[in-house]
Design a protein with these regions (language model features):
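Short Gly/Ser/Thr- and Asp/Glu-enriched loop/turn motifs at secondary-structure junctions
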Residues: 107-109, 209, 401-404
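Flexible, acidic/Gly-rich N-terminal and inter-domain linker regions that tether
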Residues: 1-61, 398-400, 437, 442
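C-terminal scaffold of the Radical SAM
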Residues: 83-102, 111-378, 439-444
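Short amphipathic alpha-helical interaction segments
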Residues: 378-392
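Short, amphipathic alpha-helical interaction segments positioned at domain boundaries
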Residues: 412-444
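Minor-groove-contacting beta-hairpin "wing" of winged helix-turn-helix DNA-binding domains
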Residues: 404-410
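N-terminal pre-triad scaffold of radical SAM enzymes
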Residues: 43-79, 96, 106-113, 119-120, ...
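A short, conserved structural fragment
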Residues: 392-402
């Protein structure tokens, strides 16, 4: 999104954002999204052991997954295993080999995003992998990497200085009771300690993103406001704050101990928008930044095509989803035999891809009519007539007064985009849970 577009998006919420969409309508939207995710994010994939070569003129983004953690958080549904150094070092070697296979196919990338798990379980291997990626793919302009508060001030972490442009740190909350309930207090320390580590990390990376979650049990309006005020005082370059996601995998623990069953997500989201207003620009429905032209966690907004490497990663290339093996053993065997880690694929219809792009456009705060015309040969008002009618009827989008091609998301639209993306990610988490279910001890 251009600077001018982001400035106009911010104008939509600048004067005390107010979400007027009735709660029953938002509940209905969530039920509708759950229907569509169940329909489209299901395991009806076809066996596959290769990915296609890149298309001329297309932009690509590279994602790499590191599936190891020293401890496993109860609310996390990402693909991860308990850390073992021998397994992790062998994994990084395989990851670098898979990168070389992508290079041999002709790929280059504009951005690299490394997620997990905990990407920094072996900082020396991570640094070596990033250096290898930069050498293989000279088009990479920005490297983003996830981490947790534990590693921020370790001596070995300095190996990432100059290699990582954007560091995203999962904090979730500064409230002591919430951190204790989520088992993070014992792992990462008191909120004041985490705050000081973040303050020091700001000087070591061009972009520091702090990742927060709202919707926890016990997270009253006062607690959430205190979190937001601490964030603005800390002043990281970027903030990502999204609702707690309850999936099939986490439903029992999250509903019983973690999730706020009485949450009014509209009031929480209004508070977040209005607290960060004036300090940050809106990047997506749940991402905020000091600058308008930087990458952020939801890379799918800016890239139609991305390639995922590593066990448990997903690729979306040319309207087809590719799924890498969730078994570390099978992943290693495939790489050792000269094949990439992909095991299955699923092609999506033109209409399904249009709906997906519509979701991302709303989540990103803007919709380009010419984008749909160029990519699908039709206007969104024709190809997605029901969806567009609903957005206008609920006051979720409005015409950009400076650009007849663009529609802007209002606070109602940002609320819709947030809930739609929340349910989309929850659907992806359910897919991960199904793919992990058959794994046994020999798959580690």
């Amino acid at each position: 999104m251009s600077l001018a577009e982001r400035a106009l998006n911010n104008a939509a919420i600048r004067d005390s954002a107010k979400i007027t969409t009735p709660r029953w309508m938002l509940d209905g939207l969530e039920h509708m999204m759950q229907h569509y995710t169940k329909r489209h994010l299901c395991l009806d994939t076809q066996a596959c052991d290769t990915i296609p070569a890149p298309m001329p003129g297309r932009k690509y983004m590279l994602y790499m997954h590191v599936p190891f953690c020293h401890t496993l958080c109860s609310f996390c549904t990402f693909h991860r295993f308990l850390f073992r150094e021998d397994k992790a070092r062998a994994y990084f070697v395989a990851l670098r080999k898979e990168m070389e296979m992508a290079k041999a196919l002709g790929y280059d990338f504009e951005e690299l995003y490394i997620g997990g798990g905990t990407t920094t379980v072996l900082v020396d291997e991570l640094a070596r992998t990033i250096e290898h990626a930069r050498n293989l793919f000279p088009g990479i302009k920005q490297v983003s990497c996830e981490s947790d508060p534990l590693h921020l001030t370790s001596t070995e972490f300095t190996q990432l200085h100059g290699l990582v442009d954007r560091l995203s740190v999962g904090v979730q909350s500064f409230d002591r009771d919430i951190l204790a309930r989520t088992d993070r207090l014992e792992k990462f320390g008191e909120p004041e300690v985490v705050y000081e580590k973040l303050l020091r990390a700001k000087d070591n990376f061009p972009i520091l993103n702090v990742d927060m979650i709202f919707g926890f049990q016990g997270q009253t309006e006062e607690v959430l406001l205190r979190d937001m005020e601490m964030l603005t005082r800390l002043g990281p370059r970027q903030i990502t704050t999204y609702p707690l996601m309850v999936t099939h995998q986490t439903r029992k623990s999250a509903k019983g101990n973690l999730a706020n069953g009485q949450q009014d997500v509209r009031k929480d989201y209004e508070l977040i928008l209005n607290t960060l207003n004036g300090h940050y620009d809106q990047l997506t429905a749940w991402s905020f930044g000091k600058s308008n032209d930087e990458g952020f966690d939801e890379y799918v907004v800016n890239y139609d095509d991305y390639l995922g490497l590593g066990s448990g990663s997903f690729s979306f290339l040319h309207d087809t989803l590719y799924v890498n093996s969730f078994s570390l053993r099978r992943y290693q065997e495939k790489i050792a035999s000269g094949k990439m880690g992909v095991e299955s694929s699923k092609h999506y219809s033109r209409h399904a891809v249009m709906q997906y792009r519509f979701l991302l456009s709303l989540f990103g705060g803007r919709l380009s009519k010419s984008y749909f015309k160029d990519n699908f040969g039709t206007s969104p008002y024709i190809g997605l007539a029901k969806e567009m009618a609903f957005m206008h009827a609920t006051g979720s989008v409005k015409q950009d007064p400076q650009d007849p091609d663009k529609l802007q998301a209002t606070p109602n639209g940002l609320m819709m985009g947030l809930l739609m993306m929340k349910n989309f990610y929850a659907g992806m988490d359910n897919v991960r849970a199904e793919l992990r279910r058959p794994l046994g001890a020999n798959d580690m």
